[in-house]
Amino acid sequence: NNVIKNANLSIKREKEKVFVLNNEKAYQYDALVFACHASQVGELLNDSSSEEEEILSLFEYTTNNVLLHHDSSLMPNEKSLWSSWNSFKKNKYDYVSYWMNNLQKLDSKRDIFVTLGNYPDVDEERVFKKIKYEHPLYSEKTIEGQKLIRSIQGKNRTYFTGAHLSYGFHEDGIKSSVEVIKIING
């Protein structure tokens, strides 16, 4: 039940146990679950097998600019056309705007949006927050990685979960975690 956040960690896997080392402290576990991007595993796992490296390298990521705002200029002109997800390809811009009031049933008099991708400039006074996220980049390699990941689940007492193992939604991260729990519990 140890949660270690923002720490300088290293991992040592042995036949019967896994050790997570944090500076001079060692935590012993029966198994290790990586609930992170596949690209982040290599930073933590310094004894990865060539099979693990090969499979995890199939998952690629892209940086997305994300905007939390209340500027309706990034939505369809007619409000009757607004939906929870609104996709746009306009000139050099390619973005998605989520209407959070509808998607999350927000109780707000103000319309709130999350926009990601390459979007036009907006009125800064209507911006709550700008964020950069790494999202899975889907390709044939990703689909191959999703198939092959099963072959390394549990090897060296190590398991992998994440939204990248399906369609990339938060729910997919939960789904893959439940699958790992079922494998661990037999």
Regions found by a protein language model. Give the residues of each.
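A conserved beta-strand/loop element that lines the FAD pocket in flavoprotein oxidoreductases
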Residues: 1-9
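Conserved beta-strand termini and adjacent loop/short-helix elements that scaffold enzyme active sites
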Residues: 6-7, 23, 161
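Short, well-ordered alpha-helix to beta-strand connector turns
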Residues: 1, 29-30, 155
